[in-house]
């Protein structure tokens, strides 16, 4: 006992020293600015900090590749499908078409005897259409439904403690006795909905799968996740490959689709190699039920800065598994399609909300670095502090550099994006990943200020979420983007004014013209390819019924 405690203390000290040393090392490399390669007039340079970032991308891609090889090898691994599984679907003001597709995909799941529990966040007449769709698709004679005035934590109008207790017991009994059940309950947010499903199921099943009501599951998705959990008893949770259902509906959903593939099949695949996936996404995840009930109450009652948390439910659920020392994994063999915002403002609000939960959970996650591989500490430091280094670089270039420095920065952003997307194209076997290089512009222009705004408003959760039946447009997300564009525009004007005081040399003019032409050609080429792709694939997708998950 004393020996284990001593080893734990040593690991805490070791991981803390490693994380601090890594951050100080990166900061020193950034401040010193040592250059390996440097041309005359600083037209091009490659320094220590750039070398570190390049090495990170290479190492991350390598481990992702190795993890995908492991996934392919496990494809032939036979398993006994004798463990009980329950699928929990969280629904809130869902688009009827998406909900119907979701439930139809649930009926096609190949895992035998899977229990389905859908909980609707809201019990008003306006929410009844979701229960009707559930009964229609799952079969009125094969499913149970219940309109609950309460939820497990709040009483409805006119309810007493006794009636609340009786109704809670009725919900639990209904869930346990039915193969498919739909519960409408008093509004309380997604976490309340998930809690109802977890609480009602109790310890009656071995594994709990989570799913959102806008998600279409691949028939083999449950089987593939069960396979991962069965292979290693120290794996507490596993997530699958989330693809975009409405990728051709707008430019923002298309770029999100390539970003999703990169996030899951490079970043999370790399994390999975070390058993420390940071977030098992809500559309497709599975947990050991025995672990789930060790922390479900603490997960529900999570507080931050004195307020109960109302977002970041899936990320905190993953962190709770990691906090117990269990591994979290990713498998590309389990797939699903899910809806993503097609309007820029709704996407921006979504990303801001996700950034809030990321930074909040980063602090919680740091307490468990010592229980996992050093890669978890390493990646947390790199991804957590990278936006701050990037902002410092941009402001410095735009206000203290030259016109060529700004142009070179833009070219470098696209070059790095092209290199990374080219590797992704090879790994996926699909040229569409080349458009990932366009996402880097979206990151620089919108995600970067959204992250800073998320930190500044991290304890505010009164905006950013809406159902899909009624889309709520919130313009507050434009504030940080507008401020960021003003800062950048001011830097460009200041640099041009400063440079205009001295006449450009002939060599400088040539470099600027060539650089501008290269940048313009890049955009013309990518935008042309985008238009061709949308005209070709967009029309085909409009008539597709999505009977199966397709990776196109």
From Swiss-Prot:
Which cofactor does the UniProt annotation name?
Mg(2+)
Pathway field = Glycan biosynthesis; hyaluronan biosynthesis
Gene3D superfamilies listed in its UniProt record:
Spore Coat Polysaccharide Biosynthesis Protein SpsA, Chain A
Per the UniProt entry, what species is this protein from, by scientific name?
Heterocephalus glaber (Naked mole rat)
Q: Where are the transmembrane segments?
A: 12-32, 46-66, 375-395, 403-423, 430-450, 476-496, 511-531
Full protein name? Hyaluronan synthase 2
Where on this protein are sugars attached?
A: 221
Function according to Swiss-Prot or TrEMBL:
Catalyzes the addition of GlcNAc or GlcUA monosaccharides to the nascent hyaluronan polymer. Therefore, it is essential to hyaluronan synthesis a major component of most extracellular matrices that has a structural role in tissues architectures and regulates cell adhesion, migration and differentiation. This is one of three isoenzymes responsible for cellular hyaluronan synthesis and it is particularly responsible for the synthesis of high molecular mass hyaluronan.
């Amino acid at each position: 006992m004393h020996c284990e405690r001593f080893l734990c203390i040593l690991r805490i000290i070791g991981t803390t020293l490693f994380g601090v040393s890594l951050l100080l090392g990166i900061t020193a490399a950034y401040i010193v600015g040592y250059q390996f390669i440097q041309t005359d007039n600083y037209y091009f340079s490659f320094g220590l900090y750039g070398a570190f970032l390049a090495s990170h991308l290479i190492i991350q891609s390598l481990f992702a590749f190795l993890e995908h090889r492991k996934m392919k090898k496990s494809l032939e691994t036979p398993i006994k499908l004798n463990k009980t599984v329950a699928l929990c679907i969280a629904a809130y003001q869902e688009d009827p078409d998406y909900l119907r597709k979701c439930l139809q995909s649930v009926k096609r799941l190949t895992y035998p005897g899977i229990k389905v529990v859908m909980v609707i966040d809201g019990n008003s007449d306006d929410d009844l259409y979701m229960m009707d769709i559930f009964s229609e698709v799952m079969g009125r004679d094969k499913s149970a439904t219940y309109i609950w005035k309460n939820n497990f934590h709040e009483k409805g109008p006119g309810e007493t403690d006794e009636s609340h207790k009786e109704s809670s017991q009725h919900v639990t009994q209904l869930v346990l006795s039915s193969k498919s059940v739909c519960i409408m309950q008093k509004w309380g947010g997604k976490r309340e909905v998930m809690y109802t499903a977890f609480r009602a199921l109790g310890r009656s099943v071995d594994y709990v799968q989570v799913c959102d009501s806008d998600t279409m599951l691949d028939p083999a998705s449950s089987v593939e996740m069960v396979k991962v959990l069965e292979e290693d008893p120290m794996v507490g949770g596993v997530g699958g490959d989330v693809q975009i259902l409405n990728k051709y509906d707008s430019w923002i959903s298309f770029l999100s689709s390539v970003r999703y593939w990169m996030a899951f099949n490079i970043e999370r695949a790399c994390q999975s190699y070390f058993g420390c996936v940071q977030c098992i996404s809500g559309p497709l995840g599975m947990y050991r039920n025995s672990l789930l009930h060790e922390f479900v109450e603490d997960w529900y009652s999570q507080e931050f800065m004195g307020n109960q948390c109302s977002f970041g439910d899936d990320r905190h659920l993953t962190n709770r598994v990691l906090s117990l020392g269990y591994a979290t994994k990713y498998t590309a063999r389990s797939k699903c399609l899910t809806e993503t915002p097609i309007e820029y403002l709704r996407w921006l609000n979504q990303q801001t909300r996700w950034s809030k939960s990321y930074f909040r959970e980063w602090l919680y996650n740091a307490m468990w670095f010592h229980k996992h591989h050093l890669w978890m500490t390493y990646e947390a430091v790199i991804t957590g502090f990278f936006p701050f280094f990037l902002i410092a670089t941009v402001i410095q270039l735009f206000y203290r550099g030259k016109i060529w420095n700004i142009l070179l920065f833009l070219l470098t952003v696209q070059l790095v994006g092209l290199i990374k997307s080219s590797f992704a194209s090879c790994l996926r076997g699909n040229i569409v990943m080349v458009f990932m290089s366009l996402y880097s512009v979206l990151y620089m222009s919108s995600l970067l200020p959204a992250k800073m705004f998320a930190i500044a408003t991290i304890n505010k959760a009164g905006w950013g979420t809406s159902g899909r039946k009624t889309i709520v447009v919130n313009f507050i997300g434009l504030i940080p983007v507008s401020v960021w564009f003003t800062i950048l525009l001011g830097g460009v004007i200041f640099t041009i004014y400063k440079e205009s005081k001295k006449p450009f040399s002939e060599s400088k003019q040539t470099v600027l013209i060539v650089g501008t032409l290269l940048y313009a050609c890049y955009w013309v080429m990518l935008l042309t390819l985008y238009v061709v792709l949308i005209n070709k694939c967009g029309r085909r997708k409009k008539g597709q019924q999505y009977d199966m998950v397709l990776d196109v």
